[in-house]
Amino acid sequence: MHSVLVLDFGSQYTQLIARRIREIGIYSEIVPYNTPLEKIREHNPGAIILSGGPSSVYGESAFHPDEGIFKLGVPILGICYGLQVIATHFGGSVDSSAKQEFGRAEIQVERHDGNPQSMLFKDIPDSHVWMSHGDKVVRMPEGFRVTASSGNSEMCAIEASGDKAALKVFGLQFHPEVQHTLYGKQLLSNFLLDIAGLTPDWSPKSFIEHQIEEIRTTVGKNTVICGISGGVDSTVAAVLVSKAIGKQLHCVFVDNGLLRKHEGDKVMKILKPLGLSVNLVDAEEIFLKRLKSIASPEKKRKIIGRTFIHIFEEQIHEEKFLVQGTLYPDVIESVSVKGPSETIKSHHNVGGLPKRMKLKLIEPLRELFKDEVRAVGRELGIDEDILMRHPFPGPGLAVRVLGSVSKTRLDILRDADEIFLEELKSQNLYHHVWQAFSVLLPVQSVGVMGDKRTYENVLALRAVESSDGMTADWAHLPHEFLSRVSNRIINEVRGINRVAYDISSKPPATIEWE
């Protein structure tokens, strides 16, 4: 099975390229732009795509790939910065544009007798595309031709032609991977299926079959342990490994007392029909004891992480392997051209287990994006209610009770959050938002209930829309809905007399408050 290799030059859209390719049914991988030719050969790519990027190809710190890629005989498509890399490599020129293009633009496709000159634009009319560039090609490389133009970019799309046509090298100034490019997926499909001749043979089913075989080979007769939370990633990972090795997998669910209302019972009920062997550990007392009087969010996260490790360590006996629900965006972040980004928050993850345990990692989902994890889950027969659950932070409600954590404050938050989620589901809004939750603030406000003055807690509601959690906009929920939720919480939850709605987007805010 041939894959498509995406060379990452630092574009914010690089992950989108890989996702769009997989939607076409072809497996894709992202590697840094400076990956050596030998490593690229090892991937045996059926096509290579050069991503966009923030640099200028004529700058001193410009990024350039190994020039050997142009001699591999593999079709190459350059996007934005990738186009400019191609243009300069083959002798063309790139310069700063007098008029930058950011946002929608219309392209005109070059035609002959009514048909596009390039196979790349088969079945694609003049249409809107998404631009994001300050530089443009100002001199065409010899042996190339223009296949599309825009009002500001005469060489908006180019390709090798004539004696160089056999190179199958193409360049686009716009971004076909972005949804605002109306025929972007069609263009990528033309490149991959018609020009590169690849077969769309990647699917959740083929992925599962490959992983089961690989897990069995890796594990042999050894036993495996998996920390499970009832969330999408850990559940899908556990079920996939269980399909491969059955009773050799032991799952541990640590109830840290920081879960949503009745969450422990719900998780065990969810996991039972999936055929998993799960050991429930009630650790509420030790977690709350160690968190007492701790207000700093970073300290809370570290205490929770250390405590989890301590408890999880007690559950490990003869196991040689640990299952972890790492996803592809985590892998990309660790190897991208930008390198690991600055730590905004410490991540609570079983991956922090001490090295002395000498557990080998099994990461069956490390090649998948979140939407693909859900698709694999469906193929495995996991219930839709589990697969479409909203993300929940590893440290649980400890980072939604701002300030110090106590059982009393946790219970107040649980009751309020249950009302919010219950109303979202009853109004068919739950699946229209990426994530929704409540936050108990470390402030109190004056209120009046009946004839009495109150001085009680303030609660914030948070709901966001997103496709991947990398960026998010606040959800524009109906005013009548918010009014009903607020009234219910204030009347039904003791200890809250004021409700606010968070209308911050990410960035600059993060989705979670801590």
Curated annotation (Swiss-Prot):
Sequence positions that bind ATP: S229, G230, G231, V232, D233, S234, T235
GO cellular component: cytosol
Keywords assigned: ATP-binding, Glutamine amidotransferase, GMP biosynthesis, Ligase, Nucleotide-binding, Purine biosynthesis
Reaction(s) catalysed by this chain's protein: XMP + L-glutamine + ATP + H2O = GMP + L-glutamate + AMP + diphosphate + 2 H(+)
Molecular functions (GO terms): ATP binding; GMP synthase activity
One Pfam match: NAD_synthase
Pathway recorded for this protein: Purine metabolism; GMP biosynthesis; GMP from XMP (L-Gln route): step 1/1
Superkingdom as given in the UniProt entry: Bacteria
Domain GMPS ATP-PPase residue range list: 202-389
Matching CDD domains: GATase1_GMP_Synthase (cd01742), GMP_synthase_C (cd01997)
UniProt-listed Enzyme Commission number(s): 6.3.5.2
Active site: residue positions: C80 (nucleophile), H175, E177
InterPro entries referenced in this protein's UniProt entry, alphabetically: Class_I_gatase-like, GATASE, GMP_synth_C, GMP_synth_GATase, GMP_synthase, GMPS_ATP_PPase_dom, NAD/GMP_synthase, Rossmann-like_a/b/a_fold
Glutamine amidotransferase type-1 domain: residues covered: 3-201
Oligomeric form and interacting partners: Homodimer.
Protein's job: Catalyzes the synthesis of GMP from XMP.
Protein name in UniProt: GMP synthase [glutamine-hydrolyzing]
Organism: Chlorobium phaeobacteroides (strain BS1)
Encoding gene per record: guaA
